[in-house]
């Protein structure tokens, strides 16, 4: 198909035809010619300024121009054509007059305008004027006009589509900018602009989306914002669609039941995945380290360890995580939120897994059993720790001092010795700790509560670990023995500290003078030398000391213990 030319869109009249038009019709003609010309120029189509254009711009009468060839067969034209598109009676009459004269001059005496009683009866109307479009000469085929604004089309379908633009009702609205359209196709085309631009960009991960609403949803990954709550179980979701899908679980039939534990599922694939828990099968293996998993999602999460990807960052302390759920749990350290409460004793936890394990205390159940020695535990974490007694495996090593640990959590806590980080702060007195357990124990000082009581002697303790240690006094148990010298200890921490005598290890270093110590308590006391603080005060004479050992020695002056020794 050749390029569009000005001749293709021009409407031409003979001199006689031109004289039949009144002033309004001639002005309309001029406007249409000029508009067509400007449209072609705008589209970049080369158009020479013909005499016709020049005359029109100067508002002169146009010269006689050649008319197009007429069709050989005389067409039949519906009179509703003129009535619909040229509603004004004088324009309709002129149209019919000019059309008939043109065909008569070409020798087509049989040309007639067919009269129809209604548009509905007219086959030409019903056919969308397809036949009319094909048989009309150039002049008539360009005469489909929009009566809202002066615009001429060469097909009825184009005119009809154009008229919709002037409809006041525009039901198709853009969610992004609020703009309305009368046709769905126009809205679809408009929305593609957003897809191309991708103007909504996430500041966290630089992901681009084509709608601001999508960006808002995406950001909830980082904020862990969960707006949609299930009325049945109080579970929350960050997208309404997720809540809707979750609600279906209540309504859905669950025909697939696990024969092992009785749990039911609404999909056979879910049951298949669940069964892996009982079989111990781990089909999803990490190519990097060989570790296997029973779920593909767990493997995906694990892979982030190797890539180092940690997209979920805590705004409070800057700590990063590989999973959004881990960040949600971590945030509870700062907020103190403990949503999981034991109905038996009222104790609350920040994790559902902790509550589940805690319940075993009340039931006496110990489901976690060591395959090596048969010892059972009420917590899986206790079993994991116990197993390392048999293996002596310590895979987590500190890069700072080389110390190795059985658990990653222990390494994390240990690192705070070097960094000095103390994220757990007491709201009562402002004292900070590097472990949450230490803060929990410390809080009991303010309440004065000592819930852990010795059945043997009645002595009460703030911490359960202190009671456990105390009981060894009555039992005489000293389970922790040094392999180097054979000395035994009641506590594992005492053995650890003792071992440093043999190794010479001094992990606690003073930043002020560089002096190192084997115990953190010694470093704490040493720091007082630099500050000049003397926190240890004698109750008898108000004399103060910078070390507790010096106060202990001083007290002997008042008790007479030192004098007695001198007399000997």
From Swiss-Prot:
<feature type="zinc finger region" description="C2H2-type 13">
    <location>
        <begin position="480"/>
        <end position="502"/>
    </location>
</feature>
<comment type="subunit">
    <text>Interacts with TRAF6.</text>
</comment>
<dbReference type="GO" id="GO:0048471">
    <property type="term" value="C:perinuclear region of cytoplasm"/>
</dbReference>
<dbReference type="GO" id="GO:0000981">
    <property type="term" value="F:DNA-binding transcription factor activity, RNA polymerase II-specific"/>
</dbReference>
<dbReference type="GO" id="GO:0010804">
    <property type="term" value="P:negative regulation of tumor necrosis factor-mediated signaling pathway"/>
</dbReference>
<feature type="zinc finger region" description="C2H2-type 3; degenerate">
    <location>
        <begin position="200"/>
        <end position="222"/>
    </location>
</feature>
<dbReference type="GO" id="GO:0006355">
    <property type="term" value="P:regulation of DNA-templated transcription"/>
</dbReference>
<keyword id="KW-0539">Nucleus</keyword>
<feature type="zinc finger region" description="C2H2-type 10">
    <location>
        <begin position="396"/>
        <end position="418"/>
    </location>
</feature>
<dbReference type="GO" id="GO:0046329">
    <property type="term" value="P:negative regulation of JNK cascade"/>
</dbReference>
<dbReference type="InterPro" id="IPR001909">
    <property type="entry name" value="KRAB"/>
</dbReference>
<dbReference type="GO" id="GO:0000122">
    <property type="term" value="P:negative regulation of transcription by RNA polymerase II"/>
</dbReference>
<feature type="domain" description="KRAB">
    <location>
        <begin position="4"/>
        <end position="75"/>
    </location>
</feature>
<keyword id="KW-0479">Metal-binding</keyword>
<dbReference type="GO" id="GO:0008270">
    <property type="term" value="F:zinc ion binding"/>
</dbReference>
<feature type="zinc finger region" description="C2H2-type 4; degenerate">
    <location>
        <begin position="228"/>
        <end position="250"/>
    </location>
</feature>
<feature type="zinc finger region" description="C2H2-type 8">
    <location>
        <begin position="340"/>
        <end position="362"/>
    </location>
</feature>
<dbReference type="GO" id="GO:2000660">
    <property type="term" value="P:negative regulation of interleukin-1-mediated signaling pathway"/>
</dbReference>
<keyword id="KW-0863">Zinc-finger</keyword>
<dbReference type="GO" id="GO:0031625">
    <property type="term" value="F:ubiquitin protein ligase binding"/>
</dbReference>
<feature type="zinc finger region" description="C2H2-type 6">
    <location>
        <begin position="284"/>
        <end position="306"/>
    </location>
</feature>
<dbReference type="GO" id="GO:0005634">
    <property type="term" value="C:nucleus"/>
</dbReference>
<feature type="zinc finger region" description="C2H2-type 12">
    <location>
        <begin position="452"/>
        <end position="474"/>
    </location>
</feature>
<dbReference type="GO" id="GO:0001960">
    <property type="term" value="P:negative regulation of cytokine-mediated signaling pathway"/>
</dbReference>
<dbReference type="GO" id="GO:0045453">
    <property type="term" value="P:bone resorption"/>
</dbReference>
<feature type="zinc finger region" description="C2H2-type 15">
    <location>
        <begin position="536"/>
        <end position="558"/>
    </location>
</feature>
<keyword id="KW-0862">Zinc</keyword>
<feature type="zinc finger region" description="C2H2-type 5">
    <location>
        <begin position="256"/>
        <end position="278"/>
    </location>
</feature>
<feature type="zinc finger region" description="C2H2-type 2; degenerate">
    <location>
        <begin position="172"/>
        <end position="194"/>
    </location>
</feature>
<dbReference type="Pfam" id="PF00096">
    <property type="entry name" value="zf-C2H2"/>
</dbReference>
<feature type="zinc finger region" description="C2H2-type 9">
    <location>
        <begin position="368"/>
        <end position="390"/>
    </location>
</feature>
<feature type="zinc finger region" description="C2H2-type 11">
    <location>
        <begin position="424"/>
        <end position="446"/>
    </location>
</feature>
<comment type="function">
    <text>May be involved in transcriptional regulation. May play a role during osteoclast differentiation by modulating TRAF6 signaling activity.</text>
</comment>
<dbReference type="GO" id="GO:0043124">
    <property type="term" value="P:negative regulation of canonical NF-kappaB signal transduction"/>
</dbReference>
<protein>
    <recommendedName>
        <fullName>Zinc finger protein 675</fullName>
    </recommendedName>
</protein>
<keyword id="KW-0805">Transcription regulation</keyword>
<dbReference type="Pfam" id="PF01352">
    <property type="entry name" value="KRAB"/>
</dbReference>
<keyword id="KW-0238">DNA-binding</keyword>
<dbReference type="InterPro" id="IPR013087">
    <property type="entry name" value="Znf_C2H2_type"/>
</dbReference>
<keyword id="KW-0804">Transcription</keyword>
<feature type="zinc finger region" description="C2H2-type 1; degenerate">
    <location>
        <begin position="144"/>
        <end position="166"/>
    </location>
</feature>
<dbReference type="GO" id="GO:0000978">
    <property type="term" value="F:RNA polymerase II cis-regulatory region sequence-specific DNA binding"/>
</dbReference>
């Amino acid at each position: 198909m050749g390029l569009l030319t000005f001749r293709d869109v021009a409407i031409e009249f003979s001199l006689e035809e031109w004289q039949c038009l009144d002033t309004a019709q001639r002005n309309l003609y001029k406007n249409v010619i000029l508009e067509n010309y400007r449209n072609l120029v705008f589209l970049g189509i080369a158009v020479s300024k013909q005499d016709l254009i020049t005359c029109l711009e100067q508002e002169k009468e146009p010269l006689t121009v050649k008319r197009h060839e007429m069709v050989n067969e005389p067409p039949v034209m519906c009179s509703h054509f003129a009535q619909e598109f040229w509603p004004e009676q004088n324009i309709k009459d002129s149209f019919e007059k000019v059309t008939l004269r043109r065909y008569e001059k070409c020798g087509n005496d049989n040309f007639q305008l067919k009269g129809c009683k209604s548009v509905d009866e007219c086959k030409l109307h019903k056919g969308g004027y397809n036949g009319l479009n094909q048989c009309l000469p150039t002049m008539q085929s360009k005469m489909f006009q929009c009566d809202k604004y002066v615009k001429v089309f060469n097909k009825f379908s184009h005119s009809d589509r154009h008229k919709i633009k002037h409809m006041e009702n525009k039901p198709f609205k853009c969610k992004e900018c609020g703009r309305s359209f009368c046709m769905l196709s126009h809205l679809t085309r408009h929305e593609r602009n957003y897809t191309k631009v991708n103007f909504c960009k996430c500041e966290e991960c630089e992901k681009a989306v084509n709608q601001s609403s999508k960006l808002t949803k995406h950001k909830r990954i980082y904020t862990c914002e969960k707006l949609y709550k299930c009325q049945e179980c109080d579970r929350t979701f960050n997208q309404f669609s997720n809540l809707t899908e979750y609600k279906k679980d209540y309504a859905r039939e669950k025909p697939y039941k696990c024969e092992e534990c009785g749990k039911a599922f609404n999909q056979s694939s879910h049951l298949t995945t669940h069964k892996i828990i009982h079989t111990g099968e781990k089909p999803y293996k990490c190519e990097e380290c060989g570790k296997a998993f029973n779920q593909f999602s767990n493997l995906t999460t694990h892979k982030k360890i190797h890539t180092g990807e940690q997209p979920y960052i805590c705004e409070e302390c800057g700590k990063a995580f590989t999973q959004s759920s881990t960040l949600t749990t971590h945030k509870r350290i700062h907020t103190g939120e403990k949503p999981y409460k034991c109905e038996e004793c009222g104790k609350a936890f920040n994790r559902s897994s902790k509550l589940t394990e805690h319940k075993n205390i009340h039931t006496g159940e110990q489901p976690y059993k060591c395959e090596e020695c048969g010892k059972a535990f009420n917590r899986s974490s206790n079993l994991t720790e116990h197993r390392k007694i048999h293996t002596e495996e310590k895979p987590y090593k500190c890069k700072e001092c080389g110390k190795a640990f059985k658990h990653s959590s222990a390494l994390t806590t240990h690192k705070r010795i070097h960094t000095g980080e103390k994220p757990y702060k007491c709201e009562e007195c402002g004292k900070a700790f590097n472990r949450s357990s230490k803060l929990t124990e410390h809080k009991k000082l303010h309440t004065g509560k000592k819930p852990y009581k010795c059945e043997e002697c009645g002595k009460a303790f703030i911490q359960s670990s202190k009671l456990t240690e105390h009981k060894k006094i009555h039992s005489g148990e000293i389970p922790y023995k040094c392999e180097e010298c054979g000395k035994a200890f009641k506590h594992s921490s005492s053995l650890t500290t003792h071992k440093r005598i043999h190794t010479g290890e001094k992990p606690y270093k003073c930043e002020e003078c560089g002096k190192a110590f084997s115990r953190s308590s010694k470093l704490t006391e040493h720091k007082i030398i630099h500050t000049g603080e003397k926190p240890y005060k004698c109750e008898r004479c108000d004399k103060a000391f910078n070390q507790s050992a010096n106060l202990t020695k001083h007290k002997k002056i008042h008790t007479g213990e030192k004098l007695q020794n001198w007399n000997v």
